[in-house]
């Protein structure tokens, strides 16, 4: 199937855009936060990128209807980069299950106190919200990284609507 995006007058639908982005494999993260009542929230996210090294800042794009975004607006969030064995966590946090945190082992991170999926993430960043802006049905959130935990493991990837594992051999 060929989708033409450069035709004059062509209208790109949400389905067209989703199909385009499925062709861009990326790592898989679970964004976590705690709301004002102390309840943890989280969602699977592939819209994540580094912004600057000084100060260390990243951005995530979250659906405006997300309960996780509401908790992130409290000022802090965690980025859990999932390893190859973290697929189940990716699936749990991409569903409408109410008690997602009851399905995985997690703990509060040392510095920011954000939910860290220690058994499913090979890296964790605890962030403080510095700025956010609404674009369409999503909100772009800039987070200054205040905490990093890393382990050596192979990352979980997602592309072409499938999970995969990075292999050093290629």
Swiss-Prot record:
Catalysed transformations (reactions): reduced riboflavin + NADP(+) = riboflavin + NADPH + 2 H(+)
One GO MF term attached to the UniProt entry: riboflavin reductase (NADPH) activity
Record keywords, A-Z: NADP, Oxidoreductase
The EC number(s) this enzyme carries: 1.5.1.30
A Pfam cross-reference name: Flavin_Reduct
Superkingdom field: Bacteria
Record flagged with keyword Nucleotide-binding: no
Enzyme class: oxidoreductase
The keyword Transmembrane helix is annotated on this UniProt entry: no
Family note: Belongs to the non-flavoprotein flavin reductase family.
Record function comment: Catalyzes the NADH-dependent reduction of FAD to provide FADH2 for the halogenase RebH.
Name of the protein in question: Flavin reductase (NADPH)
Organism: Lentzea aerocolonigenes (Lechevalieria aerocolonigenes)
């Amino acid at each position: 199937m060929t989708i033409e995006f450069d035709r004059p007058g062509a209208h790109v639908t949400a389905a067209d855009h989703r199909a385009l982005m499925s062709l861009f494999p990326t790592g898989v993260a679970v964004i976590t936060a705690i709301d004002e009542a102390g309840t943890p929230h989280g969602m699977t996210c592939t819209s994540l990128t580094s912004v600057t090294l000084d100060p260390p800042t990243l951005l995530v794009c979250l659906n405006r209807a997300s309960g996780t975004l509401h908790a992130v607006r409290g000022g802090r969030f965690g980025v859990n980069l999932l390893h190859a064995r973290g697929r189940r966590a990716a699936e749990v946090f991409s569903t409408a299950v109410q008690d997602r945190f009851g399905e995985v082992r997690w703990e509060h991170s040392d510095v920011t106190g954000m939910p860290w999926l220690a058994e499913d993430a090979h890296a964790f960043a605890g962030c403080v919200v510095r700025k956010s802006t609404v674009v369409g049905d999503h909100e772009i959130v800039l987070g200054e990284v205040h905490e990093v935990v890393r382990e050596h493991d192979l990352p979980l990837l997602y592309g072409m609507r499938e999970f995969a594992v990075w292999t050093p051999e290629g």
